[in-house]
């Protein structure tokens, strides 16, 4: 299988240096984890062999998995965080043949304060392959963002009131998945191929569906590198945001990314009492996924551009909107036929453009709007989707897709692609002990 996705004539590789692991974890732990990532690369390479060749390597692959497990257990012995050490040991047991679902699910509820660990089977991009492939990832927990997310989550009741007042008094917020933020230090296997993931949804991305507990893991350094290396440069050339002042000091963009993504996570659980996503599934799996991503994206922006989070995290609506638009355009330029997130980004831009909240000048390659127009459009879009997709209105939801989706607006999609091109940038990690 090609290391790169989606298919492109060429890719632009951006080199990103991951933090040195020894100052964070100590030399012994760092070298142990580097060994795991290196072994994961070998195992993943064997998975690309023809079936007969792979079978010939079966015994060696088992030995390699055991070597990974031994290195993870050695690291666990020197960590000063019981939860981080327990996760390593549970995943080591799974690599040796222990019950995979049982051990992985036990890891989900752990509150690591030093190290986030993933190893073993992991999904890749949905349209790249439906199979799971071998990976190993390790990230140092970012305690500042851990505390920030804890503070944000403490505002759920206030968020619910804000959403009800802004959109619909019948909307409720389901308890969100657990959330852990770290800075990636080692990566091997399928996860080290292209494009890189800045987040994983566990244990679903490990092939375990309908788990009792779920956790979102975000790599803040990777997310920031994607934004500053891909999203922001394109946005600065194409986006004209009325009143934007690059000279005005603003909090770290990384704060906005983490807060928006937590808002996105929470947005997946904003529903009406009667919402049944099986009804939404009648639109087809791809359309259902796309609409759920649209709503999560928009709820995320709503939460970081106003309401209780703004004061708590010192967030400004103008910066929040700019970051959101830059990310929306990055997702869209990946190609809506390859990623549900890109299809969602297309519908978002399509709605904003068709209803006059955004103007796209294809000749000048400019996308023009204002903070106020975007927020007004987002509120209108969420109100529409709450009354259709969340209200189990099959015909109303179909009408939204038929009016704003890429199938209905093929000419707009084609003109956008011809004018603004598609993203070819991917990250490559420089990993050091």
Locate the predicted segments by residue.
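Extended, compositionally biased alpha-helical segments that mediate assembly or anchoring
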Residues: 144, 391-433
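Short, glycine/acidic-rich hinge or "gate" loops at secondary-structure transitions
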Residues: 84-88, 171-177, 279-281, 309-323
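Post-HEXXH active-site segment of zinc metalloproteases
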Residues: 272-294
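Contiguous, non-catalytic segments that form substrate-binding/exosite surfaces or channel walls
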Residues: 66-246, 253
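Long, well-structured alpha-helical subdomains associated
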Residues: 301-403
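N-terminal helix-rich structural modules
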Residues: 1-104
